Structures are given as structure tokens and as C-alpha cells.
């Protein structure tokens, strides 16, 4: 469960408050969409939850708890078991999340150390099933595409898979 309590984000340089006293919780199995006007702090809040804000540039106040653990106090080198495995974020512009010169299948393989043809084949099977789960049934086409060949919505679904 994710619990955000009285979260405020301020720049250290200009002292500008970017997010003021945001609180919400999300239970296991629930999805959350942050919606609001441009500049209202949606992306900053998401980046804070994912610990993607440079602590030298921002003052963070409040609490971000994941399953009871205070995430703002966790050391950055301990976040590997958290980001992507337990909690994820889909950016507004998915084009910025992919390397433009690599096919999507290759980029997805980079996250998993695959040894040999057998593991690669098994991975491709799991990947095809995950893509089908997000209504992308033509896995071979997706795997062999470059990011610029697909729509933003399709790329967002690839990220979810």
C-alpha cells in the first residue's frame, strides 16, 4: 500500500513551492491516475514517489510510505527492489523512456540478464503474454519495432507490460 501524507516539494535554489500538502493512499490492486491542470505538480509528485528528484535540488517534506516503510528515508542504492518491481510510473511522454536506436525487444531484454538461446526464447514467450495482457497481441511486430514506429499509447502499454 502507498500512503502519501502532507507531501510538499520546494526548490532549494528559488524556494518556490511546487507541490503543497498533498495526501492520498492507494491500496494493493488499485491503480491511481494523477490528473490536474498543467503545472499543478502531478509529475513532481510522481517523481518524488519514485525517488527520481535530486535531493540536492529539492526540499521534500511529508511522508511517502510503501507498505509501511518510509521511502523518503531509504538510501538510493536500496531502491532497486522497489522501482519497477513493486511500483512503476508511466511518463507522460513515453518516447523519452526508450532509446531511439534500439528495437523495443532488445531494450526489454536489457533489463534481464539472459544466458543463451533457451532463456531468450522463454523470455520472448513471457513478453508476448505480457503484451497480450495489455491488448497488444502482435508481439513479434512490437518486439521488432523501433520506438518511433509506434504511437505514444502503444508505447505506454509496452511500458506497462
Predicted regions and their residues:
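Conserved ABC transporter NBD signature motif
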Residues: 58-70
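Q-loop/switch helix immediately C-terminal to the Walker
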Residues: 93, 100-114, 126
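Hydrophobic anchor residue at the start of the ABC signature
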Residues: 160
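Conserved ABC ATPase signature
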Residues: 145-150, 154
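The feature captures the beta-strand-to-loop junction immediately N-terminal to the Walker
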Residues: 35-37
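Conserved structural motif at the start of ABC-family nucleotide-binding domains
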Residues: 2-4, 19-21, 82
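Conserved ABC ATPase "signature" region
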Residues: 70, 121-141
Amino acid at each position: 500500500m502507498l500512503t502519501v501524507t502532507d507531501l510538499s516539494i520546494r526548490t532549494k535554489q528559488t524556494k518556490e513551492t511546487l507541490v503543497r500538502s498533498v495526501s492520498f493512499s492507494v491500496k494493493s490492486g488499485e491503480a491511481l491516475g494523477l490528473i490536474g491542470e498543467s503545472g499543478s505538480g502531478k509529475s513532481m509528485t510522481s517523481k518524488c514517489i519514485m525517488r527520481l528528484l535530486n535531493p540536492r535540488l529539492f526540499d521534500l517534506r511529508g511522508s511517502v510510505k510503501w507498505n509501511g516503510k518510509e521511502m523518503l528515508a531509504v538510501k538510493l542504492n536500496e531502491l532497486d527492489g522497489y522501482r519497477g518491481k513493486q511500483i512503476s510510473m508511466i511518463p507522460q511522454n513515453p518516447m523519452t523512456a526508450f532509446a531511439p536506436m534500439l528495437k523495443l525487444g532488445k531494450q526489454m531484454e536489457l533489463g534481464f540478464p539472459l544466458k543463451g538461446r533457451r532463456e531468450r526464447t522463454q523470455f520472448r514467450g513471457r513478453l508476448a503474454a505480457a503484451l497480450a495482457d495489455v491488448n497488444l497481441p502482435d508481439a513479434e511486430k512490437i518486439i521488432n519495432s523501433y520506438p518511433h514506429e509506434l504511437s505514444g499509447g502503444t508505447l505506454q502499454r509496452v511500458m506497462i507490460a
